[in-house]
Amino acid sequence: ISRLDGKVAVIIGGAGAIGIATARQFAALGARVALVHRSTDPARTQPILASLQGSGHQFYTASVTDSASLNNVAAQIQNDMGAIHILVNSAGFTQPVPLNDLEALSDELIDSIFQVNWRGVFASIRAFTPHMKKAQDPVIINVSSIAAFTGMGSNLAYAAAKAGTDLMTKALAKALSPELRVVGISPGVVNTSFVPGCGPEFNQKAASATPLRRVGESDDVAQAIVALTTTLAFATGTTLVVDGGRHLVS
């Protein structure tokens, strides 16, 4: 894997499990990492920063539901750290709703899910793209989900938002080329607290239904993000599935 010395990586959703794992791998390869999260409580952020190799890493406050905050933080990061080479959109939100329970998927929940999981991704790209065009070989990585093409997952709105994210990845890869690459990553079940109520019992059932007989870990996703950033440098407009084969049997 290529080194990332001299590169600046921004991770939206930097205090989430996948964001943290990705930050650690980027830092281990020499990048300086800017982690963006809606809350930067030192009790939460300082241990994360302390776990990163190297120096120059920082936490910033912004919300993907507040475009002005994203514009401000993009300018602040460039001012503090210089040109931005890597943007990872890993912020997300969901809530379990059975696919056949139409009444439980309220208008308010649908709006919240699309606001975070689709509009928030676009708003981040819109805010950071002007600052990335000044960098060498910049790349945007959108964290999606196999729910986008299996129709399964925590709820229908989440699956639809992720399908929209995959389309966004393709469309912006064309629109922003050749200056920027835009790629995606589609995990399946990952051993995190992202989906409320899905604990060890759920993971065990999911593992038994996965060809590789385990659920993913945050590091599995982070390693794929690193690969898309480094060794897969000729890829753009594509979304890489990293799910242990789960989509084959869903």
Feature annotation, model-predicted:
Residues 15-16:
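Conserved glycine-rich cofactor-binding loop
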Residues 98-111, 206:
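Substrate-binding pocket helix/loop in short-chain dehydrogenase/reductase
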Residues 125, 161, 169:
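Active-site helix of classical SDR
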Residues 130, 173-178:
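Alpha-helical segment proximal to the catalytic Tyr-Lys
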Residues 145:
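Residue(s) in the substrate-gating loop at a strand-loop-helix junction
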Residues 177-181, 235-237:
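Short, small/polar-rich loop/turn modules that mediate ligand/substrate recognition or access, typified
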Residues 214-242, 247-248:
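C-terminal substrate-recognition "lid" of short-chain dehydrogenase/reductases
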